[in-house]
Amino acid sequence: MDAIRNGNFTSSEIFRLMKSGKAKGSWSVDAYTYIEECNRERRLGRSIEVVTDARPLSWGKCVEKRAFDVLGLEYTLCSDVTIQHPTIPFWLGSPDATDPIAVSDLKCPLTLTSFCQMVDPYYEDHKLVHEGLTIEAVRENHKDGDKFFWQIVSNGILTGRKKGKLIVYVPYYEELEEIKSIADGNPDYYWIWSADESKLPYLIKGAHYKNINVIKFDILQRDVDALTTRVLEAGEYLITV
């Protein structure tokens, strides 16, 4: 992970600042915990995060290459680039992709349960009907829905985009061979390359679900203002080392 992220607020964790406490207008315990974690990283000069189960992360990194092949050329993959807010230096993010009007976050869940929780509200009679719904369905239906929402809002602010996209991808069975080819030779992905196909998440082509699901929404000014205000307030608690 890019060292510049250490000790700063990042899009992937910024949802923690938006949690409210029990009293009206108060902050949650998790918000204060996040600020303290950033301060510890500042004192340590390194990340305090220790990944105990790297498989969900490595699956996502491996499979995103295939996902963007499926999505097409309108998207620019930028997940390895860290963007800093132009006037708030302790606010950073690494969006997965951008296109001319939107910023996108790609989710490649390792479990089919997580996939279904994200996309089920957008299906009706075996048809994808997400155009008539909003990101709110994910926020209500998935345990990390609020995290996904604020991550995209944050990256929208950092990239100057007014629209967000949550892209949810699970490969069809026929795509697993290509994914194993991507994994071949990379020690981080060895478990993917060596796994029996039945042990990997995949969909049956022509059944209920599509492999690519794009959920679009407007990034509202009220959310931009609320997040910006909260980041600035939280920044007052960051130490200088």
Task: Give residue ranges: language-model regions.
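Short alpha-helical scaffold segments that flank and stabilize functional sites
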Residues: 63, 70, 100, 158-159, ...
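Nucleic-acid nuclease catalytic cores
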Residues: 74-95, 99-230
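Charged, glycine-rich intrinsically disordered N-terminal tails and low-complexity linkers that flank
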Residues: 1-62, 66, 118-142, 173-181, ...
